[in-house]
Amino acid sequence: MNKNTQGKPSGKPVRRDGVDPVLRSRARRRAVQAIYAWQISGGNAQSLIAQFAHEQAREIADLAYFEALLHGVLDNRRDIDEALGPYLDRGIEEVDAIERAVLRLAGYELRYRLDVPYRVVINEAIESAKRFGSEHGHTYVNGVLDRAAVEWRKVESGH
């Protein structure tokens, strides 16, 4: 077994920093689902975290990252929504619930998780929007995040 995959649940190579990209992708997908459920139910964030964390653990995904994403979005929702505002063509609450969950998650990662390259954030958001959202939701998500990334990650995006 390759030393880069030894003991890693996905069996795929990990980056030098020890991050398994497959597990991170799973954590993001589950976080989108949890954010969506939270938006729809208006329920208790802690019970949603507990429910999804239990399911996350069964899938051998990156539980710590899932929890960090979910707490990050819920704790910073107002800031994220306000920051996304100039890049939206309508109010955040008028955006489809799935696309809104995807945008909030990606907005959190773009603003607060500078260790994650902006292209990774955008690509993962597009994939989540394709998987869970409406037929053309991914193009909307891409447009919003491309414009936001230029401002929020100027050094990284080269602008």
Curated annotation (Swiss-Prot):
Query: Among its keywords, does the record have Transcription?
Result: yes
Q: Which GO terms describe its biological process?
A: DNA-templated transcription termination; transcription antitermination
Q: Which GO terms describe its molecular function?
A: RNA binding
Listed InterPro entries: NusB-like_sf (IPR035926), NusB_fam (IPR011605), NusB_RsmB_TIM44 (IPR006027)
Q: Which UniProt keywords apply?
A: RNA-binding, Transcription, Transcription antitermination, Transcription regulation
Pfam families registered for this protein in UniProt: NusB (PF01029)
One term under GO cellular component = cytosol
Give the similarity note: Belongs to the NusB family.
What this chain does, per the entry, is described as:
Involved in transcription antitermination. Required for transcription of ribosomal RNA (rRNA) genes. Binds specifically to the boxA antiterminator sequence of the ribosomal RNA (rrn) operons.
Name of the molecule in the record: Transcription antitermination protein NusB
Question: Which organism is this entry from?
Answer: Stenotrophomonas maltophilia (strain K279a)
Taxonomic lineage is:
Bacteria, Pseudomonadati, Pseudomonadota, Gammaproteobacteria, Lysobacterales
